[in-house]
């Protein structure tokens, strides 16, 4: 089996703890650039060595192309060389995805996150053509985002094996939760794997993943960094302890979803990023109370 990415240093080029950054909005719903810069700095200060801008948690379906590029520019300027910045470039339209990829590369992004085309449910041959076209559009490393709960269509293992031969396709963000299959792909292809489901962060490390692309990083970046460090040093017991301690956040995310969890959780921690854009909605008072209880149980809120 070809090993297309054996020489690619994903931790150095893309990071190991990347938070899929929420996009701050002002009360009138417009993009809040000043808060975006402060949020990016806050996350890097807390232990993130990478950020994803304009991903799912960043409400990419509801932001314009101009807003995406302005947000990317703002985050790059805010964190400088302290973290790797990955731009969300995936849509259900190949031409539009290529446009976003080129614009992100021109702005200075360090990598691209390209989600499986959603809604249109393309066949596997269509996925190969789509991901290849986006990967061909720039010289940036591409992370493919495999998330069947949102896209319906998974990236099948044989499709990943084919795509792994492309020099710019270097990593997978996995929200498919097939640990055994993913472990086989890691061994066969050399692709870097990132956990895309915080509840499975530690199991993915055991299968050979290099890190996380996280929602919980908004609220628990220092704990996730400690878990990564403990696992890397062979202290699995400490990594397990941290993983269990963060468990209440899983229940909260199941109730609220990643966007609302991130924004409501930051609000509870005293960092205001505004409400989501419709069709996402903010947490109500009852939900905030339940979230606060979960965050206290996870030791991420006093």
From Swiss-Prot:
Belongs to the DapA family. NCBIfam families: dapA (TIGR00674). It comes from Mycolicibacterium gilvum (strain PYR-GCK). This is 4-hydroxy-tetrahydrodipicolinate synthase. It is found in: Cytoplasm. The record marks 56, 119 as: Part of a proton relay during catalysis. Keywords: Amino-acid biosynthesis, Cytoplasm, Diaminopimelate biosynthesis, Lyase, Lysine biosynthesis, Schiff base. The gene is dapA. Its EC number is 4.3.3.7.
